[in-house]
């Protein structure tokens, strides 16, 4: 099979898969088809009525239906105007049924695809987000889905409505003069070749447009999210140039596709009208015994053909845009979800954590991030991970809730390998607070009681906020817990956001706490309050703390000193200082040694 044949086969498979999304709307879709059948049937009627109009010019008293009872007295003088009005009404009914019900299918399809894409995002593994441009993900949900809908509904609208129009007109022409009609059929192979050539170009160009649109979304998203950095470092000109370049690239690709269509459509029209010219010559040359009305009706019907044929040929562009968009959408939908082969569910675990000979490589890289890590933590113990940035601390913390899967070594929670737990159940036992806090554009109360915590009693929410020392600023806000925090908590300070994240973790009341730089954004006073709260909360819970501040880790039951993915020292704060080794050097520098170049 050649490359072009393989591509064509792939396009057909993608398109039929896309059409499967129309299945839930098949009843509404059939109503739209009926509407388009009605619409298409009026085209030869209009041509036919002209025959009687022209014949009526020579004999106004002639009747339209001489052999039909009750209508044999109806003269052309009355019948022709009446029929034109009736045909127009019939056509309007068909147009309404077709367009309205197809719009319902189209909008439903947009909704279904967007929801499925978004739902898929929530179950994709972390590694997918590590390697995929966020702008392209957003563009798929917004731009690509619209292109796909055009292929699944708008294209079908043209194919059905204009296709039936062509069929009905050809039937009418064959009935009037089959020999002349065969002349028009002779151009169909040439039209097919032109459509096939244009389709390949349209699909190739559509893929490039969608990638370029993703780049535009990505640059805009990055700049909006980092607007403070942009302004602080005078990056306005750079970002303006970067966005202009991305937008210009998209514009040029759009123009290239428009140019293809602008060349292709006139060429197709030239072929069609050349055939019409030959047909008109033959009609005049071979008119024989045909009446003037017959000739006018035939030419009118033939003259109605170029428009639907042109629209049918142009639908290839819409279909190829949709196929290109659907290909990227289905690629995302076909990505394997997070591995969840576990079967064990526990109502609550004690929090006994044990790591045995754990090693880890990030997917699709050959560099080892963790090497033979082993330690254990009993309920109520606090384990502190210390080391310069890039030593593997956060990677280790991300393996415990299975944000990444491990293949070498074991991580046991209450004596059970974490891979044996059902994923959702495992994460229910873990509360995590990261350095980069995520808040949603909602109220303070809803940000604390998020996800599975939604619906928690207001008293519990307020108690968690108090334990996180967040009440002192919440009570000063005009709407208190009902205050909107803005996108990602933009209306709050860094320390306030951090305390809300800690309150969220406290409300979860999980037996295992992971605090990844959890107090790094707090001022000294806030950190002192948080430390007091954490001392209380950590009782009876396993706590894994990653911190650069001495005050956070000095009380740890066990400190694991990491470097280059290995545990190089372990012990209490006092024991490690007495060893006068790596930890002592970090301690002397304030525990915040920069990462080496290339560290992960």
Curated annotation (Swiss-Prot):
Gene3D superfamilies: ABC transporter type 1, transmembrane domain (1.20.1560.10), P-loop containing nucleotide triphosphate hydrolases (3.40.50.300). Coiled coil: none annotated. Belongs to the ABC transporter superfamily. Lipid exporter (TC 3.A.1.106) family. Signal peptide: none annotated. GO terms for molecular function: ABC-type oligopeptide transporter activity; ATP binding; ATP hydrolysis activity; ATPase-coupled lipid transmembrane transporter activity. Involved in lipopolysaccharide (LPS) biosynthesis. Translocates lipid A-core from the inner to the outer leaflet of the inner membrane. Transmembrane domains (TMD) form a pore in the inner membrane and the ATP-binding domain (NBD) is responsible for energy generation. It holds the Pfam family ABC_tran. It is an enzyme of class 7 (translocase). Homodimer. This is ATP-dependent lipid A-core flippase. Residues 353-589 form the ABC transporter domain. It is found in: Cell inner membrane. It catalyses: ATP + H2O + lipid A-core oligosaccharideSide 1 = ADP + phosphate + lipid A-core oligosaccharideSide 2. ATP binds at residues 387-394. It comes from Pseudomonas syringae pv. syringae (strain B728a). GO terms for cellular component: plasma membrane. Its EC number is 7.5.2.6.
């Amino acid at each position: 099979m050649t490359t072009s044949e393989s591509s064509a086969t792939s396009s057909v498979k993608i398109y039929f898969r896309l059409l499967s999304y129309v299945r839930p709307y098949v009843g509404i879709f059939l109503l739209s088809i009926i509407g388009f059948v009605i619409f298409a049937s009026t085209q030869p009627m209009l041509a036919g009525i002209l025959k009687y109009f022209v014949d009526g010019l020579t004999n106004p008293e002639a009747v339209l239906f001489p052999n039909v009872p009750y209508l044999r007295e109806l003269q052309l003088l009355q019948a022709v105007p009446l029929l034109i009005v009736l045909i127009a009404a019939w056509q309007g009914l068909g147009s309404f049924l077709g367009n309205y019900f197809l719009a319902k299918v189209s909008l439903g399809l947009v909704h279904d695809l967007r929801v499925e894409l978004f739902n898929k995002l929530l179950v994709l593994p972390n590694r997918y987000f590590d390697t995929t441009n966020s702008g392209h993900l957003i563009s798929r949900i917004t731009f690509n889905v619209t292109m796909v809908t055009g292929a699944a509904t708008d294209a079908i609208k043209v194919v059905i409505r204009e296709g039936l129009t062509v069929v009905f007109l050809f039937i009418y022409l064959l009935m009037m003069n089959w020999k002349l009609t065969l002349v028009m059929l002779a151009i169909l192979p040439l039209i097919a070749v032109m459509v096939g050539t244009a389709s390949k170009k349209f699909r190739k160009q559509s893929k490039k447009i969608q990638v370029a649109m993703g780049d535009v979304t990505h640059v805009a998203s990055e700049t909006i999210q980092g607007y403070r950095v942009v302004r602080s470092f005078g990056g306005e000109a750079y970002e303006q140039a970067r966005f202009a370049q991305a937008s210009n690239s998209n514009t040029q690709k759009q123009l290239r596709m428009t140019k293809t269509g602008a060349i292709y459509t006139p060429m197709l029209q030239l072929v069609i009208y050349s055939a019409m010219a030959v047909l008109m010559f033959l009609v005049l040359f071979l008119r024989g015994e045909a009446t003037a009305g017959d000739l006018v009706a035939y030419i009118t019907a033939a003259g109605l053909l170029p428009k639907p044929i042109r629209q049918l040929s142009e639908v290839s562009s819409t279909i190829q845009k949709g196929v290109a968009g659907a290909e990227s959408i289905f690629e995302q939908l076909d990505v394997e979800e997070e591995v969840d082969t576990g079967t064990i569910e526990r109502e609550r675990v004690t929090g006994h954590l044990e790591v045995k000979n754990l090693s880890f490589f990030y997917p699709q890289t050959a560099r080892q991030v963790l090497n033979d890590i082993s330690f254990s933590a009993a309920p109520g113990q606090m384990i502190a991970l210390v080391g310069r940035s890039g030593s593997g601390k956060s990677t280790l913390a991300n393996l415990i809730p299975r944000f990444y899967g491990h293949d070498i070594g074991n991580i046991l929670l209450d004596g059970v390998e974490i891979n044996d737990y059902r994923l959702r159940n495992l994460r229910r036992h873990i509360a995590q607070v990261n350095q980069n806090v995520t808040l949603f554009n909602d109220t303070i109360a809803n940000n604390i009681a998020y996800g599975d915590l939604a619906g928690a009693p207001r008293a519990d929410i307020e108690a968690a906020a108090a334990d996180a020392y967040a009440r002192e600023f919440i009570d000063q806000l005009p709407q208190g817990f009902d205050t909107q925090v803005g996108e990602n908590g933009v209306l709050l300070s860094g320390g306030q956001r951090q305390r809300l994240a800690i309150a969220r973790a406290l409300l979860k009341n999980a037996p295992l706490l992971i605090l990844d730089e959890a107090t790094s954004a707090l001022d000294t006073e806030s950190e002192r309050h948080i430390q007091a709260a954490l001392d209380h909360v950590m009782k009876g819970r396993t706590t894994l703390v990653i911190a650069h501040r001495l005050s956070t880790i000095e009380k740890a039951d066990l400190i694991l000193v990491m470097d280059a993915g290995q545990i190089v020292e372990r012990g209490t704060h006092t024991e490690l200082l007495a060893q006068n080794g790596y930890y002592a050097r970090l301690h002397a520098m304030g525990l915040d040694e920069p990462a080496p170049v290339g560290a992960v």
